[in-house]
From Swiss-Prot:
One GO-annotated biological process of the protein: endocytosis
Pfam families attached to this UniProt entry: DCB, Mon2_C, Sec7-like_HUS
Subcellular location: Golgi apparatus membrane
Name by which UniProt lists this protein: Protein MON2 homolog
InterPro entries reported for this sequence: ARM-type_fold (IPR016024), DCB_dom (IPR032629), Mon2/Sec7/BIG1-like_HUS (IPR032691), Mon2_C (IPR032817)
MF annotations from Gene Ontology: guanyl-nucleotide exchange factor activity
Family the UniProt entry places it in: Belongs to the MON2 family.
Length: 1616
């Protein structure tokens, strides 16, 4: 509803209701309605403007109020309120309006309250019109209502009055600030303030026309004015009024302080005055502060002290006020040191009743405080003074300590509703006092920290030094410059730190809630930090020592010590160091009895593990170090000792039991909700983690420290490590008697504290540490060094701290009297630091880098064991130190080994020392481990970092390798170390220069002298020869495997890396290395050892040396031929080889053969011929013959392998290739070759059947060479003949023997024709051809007994077939050459060849005597034999009539005759072929003995047919001599068949003949039928007998008819 509508409605109501009752009112109402109707269409703003100019419009409402017309009062009041809200009242009517309202208040409560509601609205909108007369009217209304007995009205009136006063002063203050001050308004406000003061002091005020006001209400009004308008009271008139009118009231009230409501309000006003008017009211405030100090020090009521302490808490939370107070009082000569006295009073309150607050109980109270705090509002407090309590002022419970239950829920100074003073727990007073001290500390710290950050470290340090030297003038500027504030704060801290220390020490020793303890410790951190930044060393050390003793208290130390160590502790359970400072001595006596009285009866005096409070103390220390570590200086020592002790105890605490049971205490209140032990355990875990994290951050932040600060940090840390580990245990002194520190002079106190600060607070750490425990300081040192790696690269190494670190740590682990675990930890610490620092190593070739690497590896070299130890424990420690050092070296090399350019000598010295002394110091097992670990470093160097070494380093490296090769703890290490010589040699090879040695070195001594004198100028070639000398020395003076490995590596190096050596270098190698090897002990004394294993080892070494020397000569012949005396060296080598060449040393023998072969091969490949080369060939050839002679004749070696034989033959092959030897020399060599080929003791190879063995290949190569180069075909044919004869002798046909030379024989069969071609006559003349034919007859005779020609290819023809074919081809070749030379009539040659042919024919035709074996073959290869038979017969048939062959022709045909039979009998007499009729008759007359055996069929029936056919063909030939020779042979053959038939038939009877017998008889019948001339008497006789025998059987066969016909024909012929 709009203003117009509301006013219209209200006026209409008044108008209607008053028509008949009140004409005056109706008239006034009509006038107002008329005004509204007139301005009906105006806007609201225009309407308001019109209303302000029309005073008559308000008269209806004022009339109703003035006449107290009750029925219209509310409508009128509503209208007035509506007009005031819309600012539509005219200022001119305010006085009459307030008079009308004064009349209304007499009507009742509702009217009164409505009036009190309207008045502030009017005052707000018309503050400029609130002149004193009007204010008087308002005050009269309010005071009248305030005096009402109705409390509602009274309180509302008081509130309205307060609001009016504030509105008035607010308006004045606003105008003052806007420079629009009006004199009347100013004077009215001042009169109002004075009037209020007069009301309080005199009970009435004429200016306000008020004769009474309650003191409490008046003070509240004054507080309202002061608290909101302190800038207004900077005006002199107001300041004078405060001084003259208000302060007397306050002073008077302070003098009595009996009424709590008054005292409360006085305290609040004092707080305002202290906050805002201390500058203008200095003298008065000094008096008031003196009174407060007196009250705090005297036995005043607790509620009074609480009020003052709450005021002080507010004051000290204002840093600027603190600065002003110090400037006005403490810092101003002639003034009282107000702040110092206040701080002292606060400290006294804290220490006044230690038993009440549980000092010494070490109890953490459980509060309703989750995650450190949980206020009723749900937000955690931000500071100690903002912690909300739960104490309501009733009778306090018996609570020992300070927690929420002992802190007032509503501060005493805010309890306006209380008429009687509340009950104040003494713990609350202590809490307030500590809040004030904490506020001072926190306020100063906040300012100092910000200023320190703003100006920087350097400027701040200069400022503090100026303040200390009194060169800083704080009065040069009247303004509160930051520098002036810093000076004041410095003075405040330096003058009052003892009081702070005492208060802090007592408070943190109390039974506190977690949140209070944390807030207090936070303040403690700030205070110590400020002392540190101000350079106040004595206060800093005293504070740190106190906190350290509380972090690791005496009972915790004694609980973790052994019984013997605990005996050193004083009777009260505290280490003597706990009373080191006078402050502690003071507290000791003052708090012990009270603490024991409040202590839990179940508390274990010897606490084993940390409680929550100790963890919080530790975290406090870590926070201090984190905040001001750079300025800590010597204070680090205290911290490090404490961290060490704490770490030992923490590591002993079980994971699940961080908190001892005695560290928890609950408030005895059933109405309180507290945390269980699980919550505290979680809290403690969190604090532990935070503590460790802060320590980690502390270490990392050291990287930003300045160099002096860093060095102080480092020196303190190392001093703690050294003193705790090495120095003897100091005698603990007894606790000193307590004394009052106030009685000490400043100089005396400083002396006491400085002496105490320089004394170690951790004297009991060595008593505390148990076996196997180490100090946390080592870990700190490691981390700090890791964070400050760049410092170590400083060119000024003395300033980097590196020498100090290495020296201090080495002092710990080098002294055997130090505890083993500490020695090990110190070594490990140094190793870890070295590994971290190694990451900064650079390969920059600069003096700085050189110096740093030298000192770095020198420090690494310190990690060596002490050898003069005897007990097992010390040996174990030395072993650990060695292991640590070597592992560090491995890690360094793996990480940055490629950057290491200097300091290698320390590395090699370290490796040699461990290798030489490992077994001696640690025993064989651990010694082997050390050797392996050290060798891993050496191996890494030799594989990756050889390029970083200079020449002197190489000498150290080779000496180190020699040590590892000769050690006996680990064979694998020795062998691998030998192999590393190869890596070194390969690197040196790449460094070779093009220049040769200036001279040849003939002795090792000369070489050593040169390298030692000119180590920096030595050529890589000289180093390389030194390496070879080392290896040669290993070949002589080391155990077997190493000797062998050294020999192998030595000659590998020779062969692969010596191609760039000059003549003098080679001469040096020959004299210093090869000759040394030839005269070495393993070779020269190989036969002198007694042990078979040693003999084998020496033999193996000799083999390697022999083969190696041969390889050297072979691979480098072109260079060596230019070296003087090289043949003498080679001859020396041959003499050695021959001396050792025997059955006793088979390995040496084979090495000799290999050496010969290598030398021979190299000679064959050498393309340049000169005198030296020729001498070399002859030398080798002669020694080859010697070896053959020794092997096959003189000593007759019985175990030469096929490989050795092959090597021998290959050697001579290569020699023959290289030089044109004479025929006699070649013949002699072939004699030795035969011995090698036919060496029966050699193992045979079954695979020779299909493949040429190495020996056969060598023989083949030799024969090819003899044919191609020397044209000595006859020698080759002789050799082949011998091979065939040897290969197929009777001994080779037994089944237990393996075939040999089979494949070579097949090669001979294939190539013989080519060798013989065009040389047959020559070979016949030499007898070579006959020898060849005879050798071919050997396998032909064996026939089926020959070994298989192939085990792979079954289609390969048998050996005898191949031999037969070869025989035929050679025979044809001979005939060809004979005919070509017209020597076909040469009787001697023809006779010789025919005899060989007869024997060959016999071998082709006749099977072996072992028929059962022969005829069991699946294939008899008859076709091949038939072919060979025919070829030979056709070759000789034209020449059979020669007279020279007459004697051999009969034998030839007898051979054919024997091959013509179709069967054979096993157990009967052999067939006899007669050559005369008389012999035939005799043979026919002799009957065969009947046999029941079955005949063996001749599977070669074609042979039989062809042989018989040849006989018949030649019988019918034109050569009479031949025909006459054949006739008796055929007749004898026919007779034998008939006799056999008669004998077999007489036994078989009815049984039929075998097929072979039938074929044989059919052949006989056919022959007789076709050749009647063959009939003779024996044949007549046998035919008749056969016929009768056949007819005796009743079974008729076709044979019966044939025999019948033949018999009939026989009879006819016989009759003729």
């Amino acid at each position: 509803m709009s203003l117009y509508d509301s006013l219209l409605s209200n006026l209409q109501s008044i108008n209607v209701d008053t028509r008949k009752k009140n004409a005056d009112l109706k008239k006034l109402a009509d006038g107002s309605l008329k005004f509204l109707y007139t301005n009906k269409n105006l806007s609201q703003d225009s309407l308001v403007s019109k209303l302000k100019g029309n005073e008559a419009f308000y008269k209806p409402f004022l009339f109703c109020c003035a006449k107290k017309i009750e029925r219209h009062i509310y409508i009128s009041l509503n209208s007035i309120q509506l007009l005031a809200i819309n600012d539509a009242l005219s200022p001119d009517i305010l006085e009459s309006l307030f008079n009308s309202l004064n009349a209304v208040i007499q009507l009742g409560q509702d009217s009164q309250l409505r009036v009190l509601q309207i008045i502030p609205i009017i005052c707000t909108h018309y503050a400029a019109s609130m002149k004193l007369p009007i204010l008087i009217s308002l005050f009269r209304i309010c005071f009248n209502l305030h005096n009402s007995k109705n409390s509602v009205v009274s309180n509302a009136a008081a509130a309205t009055l307060r609001q009016i006063v504030i509105l008035v002063f607010d308006y004045l203050d606003y105008d003052t600030l806007a420079h629009k001050q009006e004199a009347d308004l100013f004077l009215d406000s001042l009169s109002l303030f004075k009037g209020l003061c007069s009301l309080l002091s005199a009970g009435k005020s004429e200016s306000l026309n008020v004769d009474h006001i309650s003191t409490t209400f008046g003070l509240e009004l004054l507080e309202s004015i002061l608290v909101n308008h302190h800038r207004l009271f900077q005006i002199p008139e107001f300041q004078d009024s405060v001084r003259k009118d208000l302060l007397p009231i306050i002073t008077a009230s302070l003098a009595s302080m009996s009424d709590f409501p008054v005292a409360l309000r006085i305290s609040r006003i004092l707080n305002i005055i202290f906050q805002h008017y201390v500058t203008s009211l200095t003298l008065d405030i000094e008096v008031i502060f003196s009174f407060i100090i007196s009250s705090l020090d005297n036995s005043e009521a607790a509620w009074k002290k609480a009020l003052f302490l709450e005021v002080l808490r507010s004051i000290f939370s204002n840093t600027n006020l603190l600065y002003l107070m110090y400037t006005l009082f403490d810092g101003n000569e002639g003034r009282k040191p107000i702040i110092k006295k206040l701080v002292t009073s606060l400290s006294r309150i804290v220490n006044e009743k230690p038993s009440v607050i549980g000092v010494g109980s070490r109890v953490v109270l459980a509060d309703t405080f989750e995650d450190y705090s949980s206020t009723s509002s749900g937000n955690p407090p931000s500071s100690m003074e903002k912690v909300s309590g739960s104490f309501t002022g009733t009778k306090p419970e018996q609570i020992i300590g300070i927690c929420r239950a002992t802190i007032l829920k509503t501060p005493c100074i805010e309890q306006f509703d209380k008429q009687e003073p509340p009950i104040i727990p003494f713990a609350y007073l202590v809490y307030l006092a500590m809040c004030s001290l904490a506020s001072i500390s926190n306020g100063i710290a906040d300012f100092v920290f910000q200023f320190y950050e703003d100006v920087g470290k350097k400027e701040f340090t200069l400022l503090i030094e100026g303040i200390k030297c009194e060169n800083f003038d704080s009065k040069e500027d009247s303004t509160a410059r930051p520098q002036n504030i810093i000076k004041c704060q410095y003075g405040l801290i330096s003058e009052n730190w003892t009081s702070f220390l005492v208060a802090y020490s007592t408070f943190v020793s109390s039974a506190l809630a977690v949140e209070l303890l944390k807030f207090c410790l936070n303040s403690y951190v700030n205070f110590v930090s400020v002392c540190t930044l101000f350079g106040l060393e004595t206060p800093r050390d005293a504070l740190l020592t106190t906190l350290s003793n509380k972090a690791v208290p005496s009972n915790l130390l004694s609980g973790n010590m052994t019984h013997s160590a605990s005996s050193s502790i004083s009777h009260n359970g505290r280490l003597s160091t706990s009373t080191m400072f006078s402050v502690e001595g003071l507290k000791e006596a003052a708090t012990t009895i009270a603490a024991i009285a409040s202590y839990d009866s179940n508390h274990d005096e010897k606490q084993k593990c940390f409680s929550l409070r100790e963890i919080l103390f530790l975290r406090c220390l870590s926070s201090i170090a984190k905040v001001v570590g750079e300025k800590m200086g010597k204070g680090w020592k205290i911290l490090f000792e404490t961290f060490d002790k704490a770490d030992i105890i923490l590591n002993r605490s079980p994971t699940s039991k961080h908190l001892s049971t005695s560290s928890l205490n609950r408030v005895n209140s059933s109405n309180s909700n507290f945390q269980d032990s699980k919550s505290f355990s979680t809290l403690m875990d969190y604090e532990l983690v935070s503590y460790k994290n802060e320590l980690s951050e502390l270490m990392y932040v050291t990287s930003s420290y300045s160099q002096p600060a860093y060095m102080e940090f480092l020196e303190s840390l190392l001093a703690v490590i050294t003193s705790s580990s090495v120095h003897p245990i100091q005698t603990l002194t007894a606790p000193r008697q307590s004394f009052n520190e106030d009685l000490l002079s400043a100089n005396t106190k400083n002396s006491v504290y400085k002496t105490s600060a320089n004394r170690s607070i951790s004297g009991g750490i060595r008593l505390l540490r148990k076996s196997s425990e180490v100090f946390y300081s080592f870990s700190i040192l490691e981390t700090v060094c890791s964070c400050n790696l760049d410092r170590f690269l400083d060119s000024k190494l003395d300033h980097s701290g590196w020498s100090l670190i290495s020296k201090s740590l080495s002092e710990v682990f080098k002294i055997i009297n130090v505890a083993p675990e500490l020695r090990t930890r110190a070594a490990n610490c140094l190793a870890n630091i070295l590994v971290d620092v190694a990451s900064r190593l650079s390969n920059e070739n600069s003096p700085d880098s050189y110096a740093f690497q030298e000192i770095f590896f020198e420090s690494l070299g310190m990690l060596l064991p002490v050898t003069e130890v005897s007990d097992n424990t010390s040996r174990g420690v030395e072993y650990d130190i060695s292991t640590i050092g070597l592992e560090a070296l491995v890690s360094i090399l793996e990480t940055v080994g490629h950057h290491v350019l200097h300091g290698w000598q320390y590395v090699f010295e370290m490796l040699r020392f461990n290798c030489l002394n490992g077994a001696t110091c640690f025993g064989s097992e651990k010694g082997a481990k050390i050797v392996r670990l050290a060798f891993s470093c050496l191996q890494l160097i030799c594989t990756d970092f050889l390029a970083s070494l200079d020449t002197s380093n190489y000498l150290d490296l080779m000496d180190t390798l020699l040590v590892f090769c000769r050690q006996l703890e680990d064979a694998n290490v020795s062998l691998t170390a030998v192999g590393l010589f190869w890596n070194v040699s390969d690197t040196l090879k790449n460094m070779f220069s093009t220049s040769d040695f200036s001279c040849a070195y003939n002795s090792v001594e000369d070489l050593y002298a040169f390298t030692s004198m000119k180590s920096k100028e030595i050529l890589p070639e000289v180093l390389w020869i030194m390496l070879l000398v080392h290896l040669a020395d290993l070949c002589e003076n080391s155990w077997a495997s190493v000797r062998n490995g050294a020999a192998q590596i030595l000659f590998r190096i020779f062969n692969s890396q010596c191609s760039k050596l000059g003549t003098n270098a080679w001469a040096s190698c020959c004299q210093l290395v090869i000759m040394k090897l030839l005269h070495s002990q393993p070779i020269q004394n190989v036969s002198d050892v007694n042990n078979k294993k040693d003999e084998d080892d020496h033999e193996q070494t000799s083999c390697l040396i022999i083969s190696g020397i041969a390889d050297v000569f072979s691979e480098n012949m072109s260079l060596l031929l230019n070296v003087n005396g090289i043949l003498d060296v080679l001859e020396e080598a041959f003499q050695l080889m021959l001396r050792l060449h025997s059955d006793i040393y088979p390995k040496i023998c084979i090495s000799n053969f290999k050496a010969l072969r290598e030398l021979s091969f190299s000679i064959s490949e050498f393309g340049k011929e000169n005198a030296t080369f020729t001498l070399l060939i002859k030398l080798v050839f002669i020694n080859w013959g010697r070896f053959c002679e020794v092997s096959f004749s003189e000593r007759r070696l019985a175990n030469i392998s096929q490989e050795g034989l092959t090597l021998l033959i290959e050697s001579v092959v290569f020699l023959l290739k290289a030089y044109n030897f004479g025929i006699e020399e070649i013949k002699d060599s072939l004699l030795q070759v035969r011995k090698a080929v036919f060496y029966e003791e050699s193992t045979s190879f079954a695979l020779d059947v299909d493949f040429l063995s190495s020996l056969q290949l060598a023989v083949e190569s030799l024969t090819d060479l003899l044919i191609s180069k020397f044209k000595l075909n006859h020698l080759v044919l002789e050799l082949w003949s011998d091979v065939l004869t040897y290969a197929f002798n009777e001994e080779k046909t037994i089944r237990a023997s393996l075939p040999t030379l089979i494949c070579l024989s097949k090669k001979i069969f294939e190539n013989a024709e080519n060798v013989v071609e065009n040389h047959s006559l020559d070979f016949l003349n030499r007898g070579t051809m006959q020898h060849m034919f005879e050798s071919l007859l050997v396998p032909m005779r064996l026939k089926y007994r020959c070994p298989k020609a192939s085990r792979v290819n079954q289609s390969t023809l048998p050996i005898w077939v191949l031999a037969s074919k070869c025989f035929v081809r050679l025979m044809i070749n001979c005939f060809k050459d004979l005919k070509g030379s017209d020597a076909i009539e040469d009787a001697e040659k023809m006779q010789c060849l025919f005899l060989l042919t007869v024997e060959a024919t016999n071998s082709i035709i006749s099977p072996n005597a072992d028929y059962e074996y022969v005829w069991s073959l699946e294939d008899v290869f008859e076709n091949e034999d038939v072919s060979s038979l025919k070829q030979l017969h056709n070759l000789w048939k034209p020449h059979l009539q020669l007279n020279c062959l007459s004697d051999e022709v009969a034998q030839y045909y007898i051979t054919l005759c024997k091959g013509s039979f179709y069967y054979q009998m096993r157990n009967t007499e052999d067939m006899v072929i007669s050559r005369s009729n008389l012999d035939i008759q005799k043979e026919a007359a002799r009957n065969f003995f009947p046999s029941t055996e079955s005949p063996v069929s001749n599977r070669r029936q074609r042979i039989a047919v062809d042989c018989f056919s040849i006989l018949l063909d030649d019988y019918n030939s034109s050569y009479e001599h031949v025909s006459l020779t054949i006739r008796p042979i055929l007749q004898s053959r026919l007779c034998w068949s008939l006799k056999r038939y008669v004998a077999d038939k007489s036994v078989s009877g009815y049984l039929p003949l075998s097929k072979s017998q039938e074929m044989d008889m059919s052949t006989v019948a056919e022959c007789l039928n076709n050749h009647p001339s063959l009939y003779s008497n024996p044949i007549h006789y046998l035919l008749r007998k056969a016929y009768h025998t056949t007819n005796a059987s009743p079974v008729a066969t076709s044979l019966n008819a044939i025999l019948g016909q033949l018999t009939l024909k026989n009879e006819v012929l016989n009759a003729i």
